[in-house]
Curated annotation (Swiss-Prot):
Database matches in Pfam families: TMP-TENI (PF02581)
Protein's UniProt name: Thiamine-phosphate synthase
Signal keyword on record: no
Binding site for Mg(2+): D74, D93
Broad class of enzyme this protein falls into: transferase
Keywords: Magnesium, Metal-binding, Thiamine biosynthesis, Transferase
Names of required cofactors: Mg(2+)
Record has Magnesium as a keyword: yes
Binding site for 4-amino-2-methyl-5-(diphosphooxymethyl)pyrimidine: Q37, Y38, R39, E40, K41, N73, S112, K142
Binding site for 2-[(2R,5Z)-2-carboxy-4-methylthiazol-5(2H)-ylidene]ethyl phosphate: T139, I140, S141, G171, I191, S192
């Protein structure tokens, strides 16, 4: 799982400023993302279940083509219906115990955490495959984001002996990703660093190899 978290792209139709979500996703897959989470939320997102399912299936097919895990944000019913590779939920989404009861053994389970105690609880549950920690930096992609934690939270979680795979979340781009990895994350998740880039190949190359020339 750790290797799959290296460059973890998150997006929904609301994040796309040029082209289409499938078009941007395929470019990112060609460029080397290691995981994709379909997150359809907020202003400008698809509103009907049928639209979301149709888009999810199109994205899932692209991920399968490039052998990259396809994860759905929050929508357990949709993830189970289409056989997603994983489900990711936040502290305020569907209760994690309910998600575990529905999904354990069928797909990977990811959980967002914002503190050492939440990370410890995720590990104690035994069925969470990885945790998303953040927001590390200020983010424009999530209107209801928690307060910014900085990279210190990653160091604190690792010092506490928590061994779950970690992906850093929130305001991460090719210029600051090295800090996130150095602090203890196994990978970085990005939205706008890819969706708002004119050259996602360069961005993803730098995310995979921090410090490499663009």
């Amino acid at each position: 799982m750790r290797a799959e978290l290296a460059v973890y792209f998150i997006a929904g139709t609301q994040d796309i400023v040029r082209g289409t979500l499938p078009g941007v996703l395929e470019e990112a897959l060609k460029a080397g993302i290691t995981c994709f989470q379909y997150r359809e939320k907020g202003v400008g997102s698809l509103q009907t279940a049928s639209e979301r399912k149709e888009m999810a299936l199109e994205c899932q097919q692209l991920c399968a083509k490039y052998q990259v895990p396809f994860i759905i944000n929050d929508d357990v019913a949709l993830a189970l219906e289409i056989g997603a590779d994983g489900i990711h939920v936040g502290q305020n989404d569907e209760g994690i115990r309910q998600v575990i009861a529905s999904c354990a053994g069928k797909m990977k389970i990811g959980l967002s955490v914002h503190s050492v105690s939440e990370a410890a609880e995720a590990e104690r549950l035994g069925a969470v495959d990885y945790i998303g920690v953040g927001p590390i930096f200020p983010t424009i992609s999530k209107a209801d984001a928690e307060p910014v934690s900085g990279t210190a939270i990653l160091e604190e979680i690792r010092r506490a002996g928590i061994k779950l795979p970690i992906v850093g979340i929130g305001g991460i781009n090719e210029k600051n990703s090295a800090e996130v990895l150095t602090a203890g994350a196994d990978g970085v998740s990005v939205i706008s660093a890819i969706t708002r880039s004119d050259d996602c190949y360069s961005v993803i190359k730098q995310l995979k190899n921090p410090g490499s020339p663009s």
